[in-house]
Every structure is written in structure tokens, then in C-alpha cells.
Amino acid sequence: MYSFADVDNSLKQHRLIKKINISTFGFSRGAALARAFTNQFMWQCESDCNGLSYGTGKYPIEFKFMGIFDTVASFGLPATSLNNNLTFDGRDMVIDERIKMCVHHVAGNELRFAFPVDLIHKGNGQIANPNWKELVYPGMHSDVGGGYTPGSQNVN
């Protein structure tokens, strides 16, 4: 696992870098981690009139795309009070408006209470950036993420 200092040291070795483009992807809790990682990375950047820059080399950086599938930010055992220190606070799940494009695929028929989805729209139902899309698909959480094998589900 790299720290931000490791990333900065690696960048110093490549003096021909003109711009850093970042895209993140994830399903379920991985989508929550993609959102949190992107925010943590953005908080390490400096912002000016030209956009974002990163590291001691002030490399221009752009967060191009976030592809997330049915974000679930709950960690640990459902319906327990165990504190596992793996919960996110509200700002970790907020998608920064400087992300150029975001697509979030969401399960429309999830019934399990342990899989609450964290939508990308604000509380008022509006999406912050017109280049972002939240698409609802029929099925449950693992239908969206591809976890069920064909023919493994039955109606009874």
C-alpha cells in the first residue's frame, strides 16, 4: 500500500509528467472506498485558478471519471453496535463537484437492510454536476455487481 508521500516521491523520479489523470472504480464497499480515496486524494491537492495540483512538483491533476456500482458504505456486522472503526463520516461519501464524470449504477430492488445504498444526489434529489448520472437497474445488489451466476436465482 502506498502513502501519499510514496506517490510524491515516485512522481519526482518522472520529470516528464505533464498532467495526472485519475479515474476510480468500485462495487459495493469498494465503491465506498473509491469515493473515500478520491476525497482523500483531493484533500492532498492544492487548488488555484488553473485547477488542482498535486505534490511538491505541483503536477496538474484532473479527476476524470468515477464508475461506481451500488455504493454501500456500511462495514461490519449488520444490526450490531460493534465499533469497528471502518465507518465513513458524511464528507467521505460526498462526491466532489470537480470530478468531471461520474456514473453510479444502483439496484432498484434491494430488500436487505444491511445494504443501504449511498446515492450521489444531494438530499434535495438534485445531482451536483450535469455530467453525472445515477442509473437504477432492476434487481438486487449483487445483480448490479455481477455476483450472481446465471440461473442461480429462483422465484418461489
Residue ranges and their predicted role:
Residues 1-3:
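Core alpha/beta nucleotide-donor-binding catalytic domains of modification enzymes
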Residues 26-36:
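Glycine-rich nucleophile elbow surrounding the catalytic serine of serine-hydrolase chemistry
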